[in-house]
């Protein structure tokens, strides 16, 4: 699929409207996303940002764009230093450790590695050179080894966030310092303090301010002017506002064409944040839920909308994905006896009219939602569910069909599976594991949540079989209901009883 044939509309925070994506260089996209400050395990608010922009990255690639994706690590920061001092640990060792832990989480969530993942500590020369340019342009000033940016020299300051300069007050996300010319001025360089990491600079030893880091790295890996800049909604002010001011001051031809911001994850109607001590780490959630279920949950609302975290929502995502993979596994098993026939046919047989229609609707609905500002909410419902229902209904009919009719149906099912897999792949919900392996992993997570092992379930199944033989149906129902409350459904197939995950009949609203 050629990118030019489909118009992707993205909501641009700067203009507050959806705009058609028109790259600076045809066929190529430069994308910069602000990464984490690495001092602790990442929470699912961080996961929301990562998954949101991973979906964008994947979809741009799906549209055949050549994407240069940069996501940084802040490994030099006050929070890192404070945590390292409490731990009695070197700040860079601490941040390196949590950068690595973050990458483990990203792998679990199926987030593709960006083209570049720079760390602040590795780009001091770029940062210092940019600060020098800002001072040369009379937009920065030095005070006792510190360097501040003069916001009065930035005529468009506040345009992105809607924060008027005269309304900006010290103490409101703005550091209080009487040496500043304007309370809203912010640090480009901080003079060294005892027992803190520092680097040599023209203004003496010190370390960079937070905002200059992203300006320097985006210019270094992309250019002063690039296509898309992303991050969490909380970064609009002051971080992104300050980035714009710095880059414009240092570079004549600069700017970002599209500013994208993902919504917060909330818990009990409050933004999830480490500072509020109300966060759930990615590692904590994936200990009892499959990472794909967490990813599905994070895509269950349009990326700009707030997302309310509840256990019941995670259970819903887990159940929805299990159904998808169980259907695809059933399809694999159903097609297995006909592989030789499909090979011999060699594509001679045509798809059924209904099969073609199913695929067309699936693809059309998927593309229309994604092209409309990456609207992943309910993306695996509608036409996608119709495709799954068609698979399930068709598998039971295969043996009864005449050869020619059966071959057309087999070809249709193969093509429907390809279309279903493509959607999963673009959404990052497809792994290198087989369907059976993913289902096995999801069942294991169900057992962890239910606090019961395979042996415990087997024992309860045997007790239920005995109860049914004795016509003790009250006992039989009690066992079934007990397991259903834990998210385990029993199914009687012939003389055999098997289990699969289900939505718990009494799911808690939070975890």
Swiss-Prot record:
<keyword id="KW-0802">TPR repeat</keyword>
<dbReference type="GO" id="GO:0005524">
    <property type="term" value="F:ATP binding"/>
</dbReference>
<keyword id="KW-0479">Metal-binding</keyword>
<keyword id="KW-0648">Protein biosynthesis</keyword>
<feature type="binding site">
    <location>
        <position position="274"/>
    </location>
    <ligand>
        <name>ATP</name>
    </ligand>
</feature>
<feature type="short sequence motif" description="'KMSKS' region">
    <location>
        <begin position="271"/>
        <end position="275"/>
    </location>
</feature>
<keyword id="KW-0436">Ligase</keyword>
<dbReference type="Pfam" id="PF01406">
    <property type="entry name" value="tRNA-synt_1e"/>
</dbReference>
<feature type="binding site">
    <location>
        <position position="34"/>
    </location>
    <ligand>
        <name>Zn(2+)</name>
    </ligand>
</feature>
<dbReference type="InterPro" id="IPR056411">
    <property type="entry name" value="CysS_C"/>
</dbReference>
<dbReference type="GO" id="GO:0046872">
    <property type="term" value="F:metal ion binding"/>
</dbReference>
<feature type="binding site">
    <location>
        <position position="239"/>
    </location>
    <ligand>
        <name>Zn(2+)</name>
    </ligand>
</feature>
<dbReference type="GO" id="GO:0004817">
    <property type="term" value="F:cysteine-tRNA ligase activity"/>
</dbReference>
<dbReference type="InterPro" id="IPR015803">
    <property type="entry name" value="Cys-tRNA-ligase"/>
</dbReference>
<dbReference type="InterPro" id="IPR009080">
    <property type="entry name" value="tRNAsynth_Ia_anticodon-bd"/>
</dbReference>
<keyword id="KW-0862">Zinc</keyword>
<keyword id="KW-0030">Aminoacyl-tRNA synthetase</keyword>
<comment type="similarity">
    <text>Belongs to the class-I aminoacyl-tRNA synthetase family.</text>
</comment>
<keyword id="KW-0067">ATP-binding</keyword>
<dbReference type="GO" id="GO:0006423">
    <property type="term" value="P:cysteinyl-tRNA aminoacylation"/>
</dbReference>
<feature type="repeat" description="TPR 1">
    <location>
        <begin position="315"/>
        <end position="348"/>
    </location>
</feature>
<feature type="short sequence motif" description="'HIGH' region">
    <location>
        <begin position="36"/>
        <end position="46"/>
    </location>
</feature>
<keyword id="KW-0547">Nucleotide-binding</keyword>
<keyword id="KW-0963">Cytoplasm</keyword>
<feature type="repeat" description="TPR 2">
    <location>
        <begin position="368"/>
        <end position="401"/>
    </location>
</feature>
<keyword id="KW-0677">Repeat</keyword>
<dbReference type="InterPro" id="IPR014729">
    <property type="entry name" value="Rossmann-like_a/b/a_fold"/>
</dbReference>
<dbReference type="InterPro" id="IPR032678">
    <property type="entry name" value="tRNA-synt_1_cat_dom"/>
</dbReference>
<feature type="binding site">
    <location>
        <position position="243"/>
    </location>
    <ligand>
        <name>Zn(2+)</name>
    </ligand>
</feature>
<feature type="binding site">
    <location>
        <position position="214"/>
    </location>
    <ligand>
        <name>Zn(2+)</name>
    </ligand>
</feature>
<protein>
    <recommendedName>
        <fullName>Cysteine--tRNA ligase 2, cytoplasmic</fullName>
        <ecNumber>6.1.1.16</ecNumber>
    </recommendedName>
</protein>
<dbReference type="Pfam" id="PF23493">
    <property type="entry name" value="CysS_C"/>
</dbReference>
<dbReference type="GO" id="GO:0005829">
    <property type="term" value="C:cytosol"/>
</dbReference>
<dbReference type="InterPro" id="IPR024909">
    <property type="entry name" value="Cys-tRNA/MSH_ligase"/>
</dbReference>
């Amino acid at each position: 699929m050629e990118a030019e044939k489909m118009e992707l509309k993205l909501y641009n925070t700067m203009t507050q409207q959806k705009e058609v994506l028109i790259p600076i260089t045809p066929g190529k996209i430069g994308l910069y996303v602000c990464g984490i400050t690495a001092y602790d395990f990442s929470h699912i608010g961080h996961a929301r940002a990562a998954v949101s922009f991973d979906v964008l990255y994947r979809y741009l690639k799906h549209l055949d764009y050549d994407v240069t994706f940069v996501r940084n690590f802040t490994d030099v920061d006050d929070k890192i230093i404070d945590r390292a001092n409490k731990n009695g640990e070197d700040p860079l060792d601490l941040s390196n450790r949590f950068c690595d832990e973050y990458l483990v989480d990203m792998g679990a969530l199926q987030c593709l590695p960006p083209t570049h993942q720079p760390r602040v500590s590795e780009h001091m020369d770029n940062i210092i050179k940019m600060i020098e340019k800002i001072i040369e342009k009379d937009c920065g000033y030095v005070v006792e080894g510190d360097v501040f940016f003069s916001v009065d020299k930035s005529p468009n300051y506040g345009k992105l966030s809607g924060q008027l300069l005269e309304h900006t007050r010290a103490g409101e996300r703005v550091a209080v310092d009487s040496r500043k010319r304007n309370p809203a001025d912010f640090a480009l360089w901080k003079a060294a303090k005892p027992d803190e990491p520092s680097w040599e600079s023209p203004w003496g030893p010190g370390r960079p301010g937070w905002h200059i880091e992203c300006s320097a790295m985006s210019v270094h890996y992309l250019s002063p002017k690039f296509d898309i800049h992303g991050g969490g909604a909380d970064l609009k002010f002051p971080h992104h506002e300050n980035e714009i001011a710095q880059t414009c001051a240092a570079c004549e031809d600069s700017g970002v064409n599209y500013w994208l911001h993902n919504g917060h994850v909330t818990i009990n109607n409050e933004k999830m944040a480490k500072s509020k001590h109300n966060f759930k780490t990615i590692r904590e959630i994936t200990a009892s839920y499959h990472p794909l279920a967490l990813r599905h949950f994070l895509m269950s609302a349009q990326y700009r909308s707030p997302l309310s975290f509840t256990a019941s929502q995670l259970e819903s995502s887990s159940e929805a994905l299990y159904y998808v993979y169980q259907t695809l596994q059933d399809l694999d098993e159903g097609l297995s006896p006909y592989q030789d026939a499909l090979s011999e046919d060699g594509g001679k047989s045509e798809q059924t009219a209904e099969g073609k229609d199913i695929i067309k609707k699936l693809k059309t609905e998927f593309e229309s939602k994604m092209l409309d500002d990456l609207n992943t909410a309910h993306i695996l419902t509608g036409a996608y569910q119709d495709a799954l229902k068609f698979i399930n209904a068709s598998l039971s009919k295969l043996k009864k069909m005449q050869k020619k009719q059966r071959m057309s149906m087999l070809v249709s099912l193969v093509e429907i599976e390809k279309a279903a897999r493509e959607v999963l792949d673009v959404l990052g919900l497809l792994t290198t594991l087989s369907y059976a392996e993913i289902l096995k992993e999801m069942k294991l997570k169900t057992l962890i949540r239910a606090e019961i092992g395979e042996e415990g379930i087997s024992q309860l199944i045997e007790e239920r079989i005995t109860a049914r033989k004795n016509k003790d149906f009250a006992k039989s129902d009690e066992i079934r209901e007990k397991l259903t409350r834990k998210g385990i459904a029993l199914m009687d197939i012939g003389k055999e009883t098997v289990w699969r995950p289900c939505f718990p009949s009494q799911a808690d609203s939070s975890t």
